[in-house]
Design a protein with these regions (language model features):
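Extended, leucine-rich alpha-helical cores of fungal transcription factors
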Residues: 1-122, 126, 174-229, 233, ...
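C-terminal, low-complexity intrinsically disordered regions in eukaryotic proteins
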Residues: 127, 136-172, 222, 286, ...
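Conserved, structured regulatory domains from eukaryotic proteins
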Residues: 129-131
Length: 417
């Protein structure tokens, strides 16, 4: 996000056109893809996502996934001609596209196309590339059972063979040299993304509406159990810390890695609990569902939204946004939390809304206002949220109002649809 959105937009479009000319040759879609072409297509999708062109990013990501599948990146490499570092690079490319498709699918509400049943690509080893020459790391990269035994200590479920009693000493040696780093962060992020995809498939597929209330409750309970398991396995260096205690303190993260994982975790929690927010989906007293369950899960959803916003600084901080936060999807996180609060407020009676929720909505509105000044996609989101807030003025009053001069005209904000 840049202070002058018009100038920044012109510059980024210029860079994008150059990248497109260089990377997407006239026959790029007809030629057999190679690893470099897959990376180019994936980077173009990320670039479009960062610009706010989510629909275009979703389409290009689909092309990249097709190219990767054509290369067999969705399968574990058994080739003797591919070096171990090259295999790890291919694994990272595949899981990067996997996470990117999940993010874009959640943003657009479109179905996810990758089927886990057709994927045997193992998660990459949680070590930096400069450690690939160490004996223990080489052993883990070579032996898939040892790899899974190691990963079982930091993720909920490895890919491929389930962990079994193996070389315990190798795993212990590897754990001794395993430190929080970008590779370990990526493994934890992918593991959480896999849970998020399961949540989408079990709770948001159109055919799910045919399931009974008990089936929905079981799916939601299972999803939250998996999220809690993921959180319990998260390495200590990536965990968020609560200051103040008693469940009412502010949340503090150590660095960009822990902040990104925390935001992703609360986003997944919102996805798992959000079905219970909708008033008309709650079972009546005569149905088989338990209304107390829906009330509890709905409260958990609102709490996750408040916790997500609690990770933001009290006042808008452009430096924090660009240098610490995962800026490429911060608008999504902000709007996701705001939407939860707006839905909850629409179902509440005036005067019954907790003060903490109102403060969270005020904070979200303040951040959207400031982001709208420097980013056109944020400006459009600010217009939409402002219109919804206006309809809820009888419930929340003007405390969370969005300043009209900060959002711009509707014709201007349509650029990033």
């Amino acid at each position: 996000m840049q202070p002058n959105s018009t100038v920044a937009n012109d510059e980024t479009l210029l860079y994008f056109s150059r990248a497109w000319k260089l990377g997407m040759q006239p026959n790029a879609l007809l030629d057999h893809p190679d690893l470099q072409q897959v990376q180019i297509e994936g980077l173009l999708a990320i670039f479009l996502l960062a610009l706010g062109h989510v629909n275009r990013a979703w389409r290009i990501c689909g092309i990249a996934i097709r190219s990767a599948t054509a290369m067999g990146l969705n399968l574990r490499s058994e080739s003797n001609y591919v070096t171990l570092p090259s295999k790890e690079s291919r694994y990272k490319v595949w899981w990067s596209l996997y996470t990117l498709e999940t993010i874009l699918g959640n943003m657009t509400g479109r179905p996810l196309n990758l089927d886990s049943d057709f994927c045997t690509t193992p998660l990459p080893v949680p070590f930096e590339e400069h450690e690939y020459n160490e004996a223990e790391v080489i052993r883990i990269m070579t032996d898939h059972k040892t790899r899974n035994n190691l990963l079982a200590h930091v993720i909920t479920r490895p890919v491929g063979e389930m962990p079994a009693a193996g070389d315990v000493q190798s795993v212990r040696n590897a754990m001794d040299i395993l430190n929080p780093n970008m590779a370990l962060y990526f493994v934890c992020y992918v593991d959480l993304t896999r849970i998020m995809r399961e949540i989408v498939e079990t709770l948001y597929a159109p055919e799910i509406v045919q399931n009974s209330a008990r089936d929905a409750e079981a799916a939601i309970t299972d999803a939250n159990a998996k999220l809690e398991k993921w959180l319990s396995k998260l390495p200590a260096g990536f965990r968020i810390v609560e200051e103040g205690g008693g469940g009412g303190g502010s949340l503090v993260t150590h660095d960009r890695y822990s902040l990104s994982l925390a935001l992703h975790y609360y986003s997944a929690t919102i996805l798992a609990c959000k079905p219970c927010l909708h008033y008309f989906d709650k079972p009546s007293s005569s149905s088989s569902g338990d209304s107390s369950f829906y009330t509890y899960v709905a409260a958990s959803c609102v709490q996750a939204a408040c916790r997500m916003l609690d990770l933001f600084p009290a006042e808008f901080d452009g430096t924090w946004l660009n240098q610490v936060a995962p800026w490429w999807c911060m608008l999504h996180y902000t709007v996701q939390a705001t939407a939860v609060l707006l839905i909850d407020f629409s179902l509440c009676h005036p005067g019954s809304i907790p003060e903490a929720s109102i403060q969270a909505l005020e904070k979200a509105a303040s951040w959207l206002n400031e982001m709208a000044r420097i980013d056109l996609a944020s400006r459009r989101a600010c217009v939409v949220c402002g219109a919804l807030l206006a309809k809820l003025s009888g419930v929340v009053g003007n405390r969370a109002g969005v300043a009209e001069e900060a959002v711009g005209s509707r014709s201007e904000v349509g650029l990033y649809r």
